[in-house]
Amino acid sequence: MKAIETEYKDILFRSRLEARWAILFDALELEWVYEPDCFILSNNQKYTPDFYIPKYDLYIEV
């Protein structure tokens, strides 16, 4: 099944699921950043976590 891009708060999310998580973070009054960083893994692949929650210094992949 192909992900459906979804816009929320002027951000185009790659999927509806990611947008729903953003809505949940807002409901919980958690500051969040969407796809803030890109990391290079040991096998030289790029990895971009979906969210960063600054309050907890936490990256989240949904």
Predicted regions mapped to residue ranges:
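Acidic-basic catalytic patches of nuclease active cores, encompassing PD-(D/E)XK
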Residues: M1-E35
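A structural signal for short, well-ordered beta-strand segments and their strand-loop junctions
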Residues: V33-Y34, Y59-E61
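Active-site beta-strand-loop-beta-strand hairpin of nuclease catalytic cores
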Residues: N44-I60
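A short acidic/basic microdomain associated with nuclease active sites
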Residues: L28-N43, D50
